Design a protein with these regions (language model features):
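Short, flexible loop segments at the rims of nucleotide/cofactor-binding pockets, characterized by
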Residues: 11-13, 78-84
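Short secondary-structure boundary segments
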Residues: 38, 106-108
Length: 133
C-alpha cells in the first residue's frame, strides 16, 4: 500500500507520538510504503528547526530517520488553485508522483475536505489506522 503522510503527520509522530507514530511504525514493519518529496523535507526542516527550535543536528537526525522510512519521489506536475495553502499543493504533487493509494493528513481545513484527489484517498490518521484493522 502506497502512502504519502503529510508533513503534519511526521511532526506529530516525532514530537507527540500517538496514532501518527503508529503510522510510522507500519512503515518500519513494511506494512505500508511511505513516500515524500524534497519540498516536504524542506518543510519538515523548517518546522522542526524554526517552530520547535530544534538544533540543526537534531533536525538532521529526525530527517535521516524519516528518509530511512520513506522513498523520495520527484513530482513532475506543479499544482495550483486547488487548495488555499501552497504547501498543500506540494503534498498533493507528492501523492500523485508516488501513485499513492492514500494521503494521510491532519489538515482539516484544506486537504481532508477534498476526500479524494485524482484517485488518492485523503484520510485522517485515525481513519487510516481504522481501515487497516
Amino acid at each position: 500500500m502506497r502512502v504519502v503522510a503529510d508533513t503534519n503527520i511526521y511532526i506529530s509522530a516525532i514530537v507527540f507520538g500517538g496514532s501518527c507514530e503508529a503510522i510510522l511504525a507500519l512503515a518500519r514493519a513494511h506494512v505500508i510504503e511511505l513516500y515524500l518529496s524534497s519540498a516536504m523535507q524542506g518543510e519538515l526542516r523548517s518546522v522542526l528547526g524554526q517552530t520547535f527550535g530544534w538544533s540543526p543536528s537534531r533536525v538532521k537526525e529526525a530527517l535521516a530517520e524519516i528518509t530511512r522510512l520513506a522513498s523520495l519521489v520527484r513530482p513532475n506536475v506543479r499544482l495550483s488553485g486547488i487548495v488555499a495553502n501552497d504547501a498543500d499543493h506540494r503534498i498533493l504533487e507528492c501523492a500523485l508522483a508516488a501513485r499513492a493509494d492514500f494521503l494521510v493528513t491532519g489538515d482539516k481545513r484544506h486537504l481532508l475536505p477534498l476526500k479524494t484527489f485524482r484517485g488518492v484517498q485523503i484520510v485522517s490518521p485515525r481513519a487510516f489506522l481504522d481501515l487497516l484493522r
